[in-house]
Amino acid sequence: MSLFQVYARALQYLAVHKFRVGAIVIANIVLAAITIAEPILFGRIIDAISSQKDVAPMLLLWAGFGVFNTIAFVLVSREADRLAHGRRASLLTEAFGRIVSMPLSWHSQRGTSNALHTLLRACETLFGLWLEFMRQHLATAVALMLLIPTAFAMDVRLSLILVVLGAAYVMISKVVMSRTKEGQAAVEGHYHTVFSHVSDSISNVSVVHSYNRIEAETRELKKFTQRLLSAQYPVLDWWALASGLNRIASTISMMAILVIGTVLVQRGELGVGEVIAFIGFANLLIGRLDQMKAFATQIFEARAKLEDFFQLEDSVQDREEPADAGELKGVVGEVEFRDISFDFANSAQGVRNVSFKAKAGQTIAIVGPTGAGKTTLVNLLQRVHEPKHGQILIDGVDIATVTRKSLRRSIATVFQDAGLMNRSIGENIRLGREDASLDEVMAAAEAAAASDFIEDRLNGYDTVVGERGNRLSGGERQRVAIARAILKNAPILVLDEATSALDVETEARVKDAIDALRKDRTTFIIAHRLSTVREADLVIFMDQGRVVEMGGFHELSQSNGRFAALLRASGILTDEDVRKSLTAA
Ligand SMILES: Nc1ncnc2c1ncn2[C@@H]1O[C@H](COP(=O)(O)OP(=O)(O)OP(=O)(O)O)[C@@H](O)[C@H]1O
């Protein structure tokens, strides 16, 4: 994207509140006109003093300019602050909504902290540029536009010096921008690496402590920051050189105005006051050009951040729901996978040609070695991932044709890692159903055998659980997650290793709740503890993304296949059981 395209697109994010922005623009034009009038007035005062005229009215006018300038500046700043802060808040909310709705595969590909970093930096950048533009640079730009014609009206010869000075500034900035374009993009890349490292280490602080990684992680960060600085120094050097060259250009122009102005005064072609006004113009021009250069540097530095953000936005927009997506309603719970295949991006992992059909109300156990694709399969059912091939039908409706929202309303999931948010226990359970009463929340907790430990806590249901529920034990987290699914009361239930962290006694209590919940619901159970899948109507044994065995629990346990071998290995089935069943067959 060219610089122009980047900022044309950036403006689309800012083109709101047109009336308020218009008022700021008008105020800035007035402010700029006063800024130009001041050196002229100053020159007139000097002339009046030297010819011993009355300067009081001009001094009064000058004071009036000062008061008006101050009041207008405060009002413009206040309005600009409000506009820019408001825009930052809305941009963050809008972009957050889109990003958070992206499939998990997108997040794992993009990197959650990377996306977060891009989003926050883009919000800050757009906000900062917008604020400075409205507060300061708009007036600067208008002042520069008014200054040159005013100067030309006074004296063409001295004005040409100002034009050459302006052109020198622009040329120097252009050269520096083209020389540092790649360097600046590299700086952005290094910023991402630094941020990802910091966020990865801090979010895994227990591992960092337990494995004595504090120094090592700090060393690693130092390495990344060094790389960042190595990329950043040459860019900064170029801009420092530009400042030096600008200073030389300003000094030369100032001297030229003085020398030529003196000659013109001596020849009687120009008054002293006019030369003084021109020196004021030159000073104004230098100050404003410096401000514009600083703004141009910011615009240039922000370019890579904004491009990164636009890429993020584009990848998000591509995945929005089609307008004609239907609503999945009145689900009974028949689930069919028809030749489903899915690959993770940049990975050989996924699932291949999975087909099965489960009747409404049945329990389906998905078993198999770790990494076999069990979680991926249930994620596909919820359209966390989109299959590359095949169809998934619920009650005969292809789930690709309905909104994700309606699909997910029909499914309650207990995640492998419980998935608790840093909120109170009550709020975590209520994620199942927002409008549930406290009594309903408590009943769900009771059914999930969670009420005892919750009520033992000082703040009961108001106890805040910490990030990812880290202030609860693994078993407590799972019971809160089960209570949440119970409260949701959806026709399809997914239990992904839902009871793996529970002791035998608690698991037995929770099992009663789950058994009650399973009734009249299609339930998918993923479990390594095979005792929990005994009641399954259908067992799907997966390995390396494929279904290798499928059938009823008794049918598979009596065959001499991998499921039976696994049952024997876990002591659920003895060799004697198998021999008996084979003989009977
Ligand atoms: N986002 C991802 N990108 C690339 N590969 C992935 C991703 N998520 C999972 N995988 C890989 O896909 C395979 C299946 O993962 P999945 O989580 O479905 O296994 P699973 O059978 O549920 O394992 P477990 O019993 O250990 O939970 C694994 O090899 C895993 O490494």
From Swiss-Prot:
Keywords: ATP-binding, Cell inner membrane, Cell membrane, Membrane, Nucleotide-binding, Sugar transport, Translocase, Transmembrane, Transmembrane helix, Transport. InterPro entries: AAA+_ATPase, ABC1_TM_dom, ABC1_TM_sf, ABC_transporter-like_ATP-bd, ABC_transporter-like_CS, NdvA, P-loop_NTPase, Type_1_exporter. ATP binds at residues 368-375. GO terms for molecular function: ABC-type beta-glucan transporter activity; ABC-type oligopeptide transporter activity; ATP binding; ATP hydrolysis activity. The keyword Ligase does not apply. It is a multi-pass membrane protein. Residues 335-569 form the ABC transporter domain. It catalyses: [(1->2)-beta-D-glucosyl](n)(in) + ATP + H2O = [(1->2)-beta-D-glucosyl](n)(out) + ADP + phosphate + H(+). The chain crosses the membrane at residues 22-42, 55-75, 136-156, 158-178, 245-265, 269-289. SUPFAM superfamilies: ABC transporter transmembrane region (SSF90123), P-loop containing nucleoside triphosphate hydrolases (SSF52540). Residues 21-301 form the ABC transmembrane type-1 domain. SMART domains: AAA. PANTHER family: ATP-BINDING CASSETTE SUB-FAMILY B MEMBER 10, MITOCHONDRIAL, ATP-DEPENDENT PERMEASE MDL1, MITOCHONDRIAL. NCBIfam families: chvA (TIGR01192), PRK13657.1 (NF010178). This is Beta-(1-->2)glucan export ATP-binding/permease protein NdvA.
